[in-house]
């Protein structure tokens, strides 16, 4: 392990021990805010500190065993020789774990997200594919125990969606889905195609971390135009007969959001405002990512929705992720929600990329 990394780990261990002492002091216990803040810091430092303590212990064991190798007692020397390989393997494993712990954490990883799927080129087939993608994400979300909340939907003329927006809530949603933003291309024979020709169409997906309720972004009410309209529901006994749907336009940027899912205008307005804040923040973050991308490629992408990331080839049952040259012949499983087949390799590559960066900068 590099000296610079060991120094960083030593500092983290010392801080962990210091915070542990502070948490036992009466003055800290009496101050709820400080106690809560230090408890959170202690919990964050605990895994890496305990791992580093195990690493130091293993290194000390290795030093002791190397000394025993020089012993005149042949039995002791033989025993030490047998133990050395085991301890060396332990050190290698702990070294790897420590490097993972040192990877900078994405502050958005624990957040809920807004998912937007929009039909692109390809007309009706693109809208149908947008529906297929939304179903894939919904199935995956259900398998993770996440909640899915529809915000708005514009239905395609022959099925699927021209655009659909939903909020997905649960544990570490953004950490799992942040690699999905970009253009998704589909190659398949449409049901209306009598000649059996393969058509190509595309959809764009945007994954945006939800803004905190404590207002990560300030919006001047004077910059908003708020319109109400009648929700375009499917009809039936619960048909929406009031102007409960909300459309909010942020005048300076031209960003427009709509929400028609709830029957209450108040609830639709609250959802639309949350989505607006998320979109405005996402636009700012995307701008920063594009600037960073000039110096460093990122698997999470630049935020450019036109960046083609994946192809779904139905005749061959093949999915290709172009960012890491990943090809999987389990397309039907993936479309049924087994998205881990794609997400896990992307996460591994992303972490390897971060580890390489860590090595370069240290």
Curated annotation (Swiss-Prot):
SMART domains in alphabetical order: PCRF
Pfam families on file: PCRF, RF-1
Record keywords: Cytoplasm, Methylation, Protein biosynthesis
Major place of residence: cytoplasm
Subcellular location(s) per record: Cytoplasm
NCBIfam families: prfA (TIGR00019), PRK00591.1 (NF001859)
Protein family: Belongs to the prokaryotic/mitochondrial release factor family.
Function recorded in the entry: Peptide chain release factor 1 directs the termination of translation in response to the peptide chain termination codons UAG and UAA.
Identification of the protein by name: Peptide chain release factor 1
């Amino acid at each position: 392990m590099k000296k610079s990394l060991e120094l960083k780990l030593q500092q983290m261990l010392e801080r962990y021990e210091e915070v542990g002492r502070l948490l036992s002091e009466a003055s800290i216990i009496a101050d709820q805010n400080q106690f809560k803040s230090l408890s959170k810091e202690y919990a964050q430092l605990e895994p890496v500190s305990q791992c580093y303590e195990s690493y130091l212990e293993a290194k000390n064991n290795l030093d002791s065993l190397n000394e025993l190798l020089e012993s005149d007692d042949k039995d002791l020397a033989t025993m030490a020789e047998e133990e050395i390989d085991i301890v060396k393997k332990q050190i290698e494993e702990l070294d790897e774990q420590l490097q993972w712990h040192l990877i900078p954490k994405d502050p958005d990883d624990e957040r809920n997200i807004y998912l937007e799927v929009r039909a692109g080129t390809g007309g009706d087939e693109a809208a149908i594919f947008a529906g297929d993608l939304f179903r894939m994400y919904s199935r995956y979300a259900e398998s993770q125990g996440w909640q899915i909340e529809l915000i708005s939907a514009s239905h395609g003329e022959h099925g699927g969606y021209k655009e659909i927006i939903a909020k997905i809530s649960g544990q570490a949603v953004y950490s799992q889905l942040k690699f999905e933003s970009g253009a998704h291309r589909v190659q398949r024979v449409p049901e209306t195609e009598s000649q059996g020709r393969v058509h190509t169409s595309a959809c764009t997906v945007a994954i945006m971390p939800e803004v905190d309720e404590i207002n990560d972004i300030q919006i001047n009410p004077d910059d908003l135009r708020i319109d109400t309209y009648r929700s375009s529901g499917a009809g039936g006994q619960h048909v929406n007969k009031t102007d409960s749907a909300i459309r909010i336009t942020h005048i300076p940027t031209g960003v427009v959001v709509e929400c028609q899912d709830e029957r209450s205008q108040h609830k639709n307005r609250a959802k639309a405002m949350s989505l607006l804040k998320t979109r405005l923040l996402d636009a700012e973050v995307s701008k920063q990512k594009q600037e960073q991308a000039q110096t460093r490629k990122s698997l999470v992408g630049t935020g450019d929705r036109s960046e083609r990331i994946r192809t779904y080839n139905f005749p061959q049952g093949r999915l290709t992720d172009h960012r890491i040259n990943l090809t999987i012949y389990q397309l039907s499983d993936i479309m049924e929600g087994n998205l881990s087949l794609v997400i896990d390799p992307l996460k591994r590559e992303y972490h390897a990329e971060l580890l390489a960066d860590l090595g370069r900068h240290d």
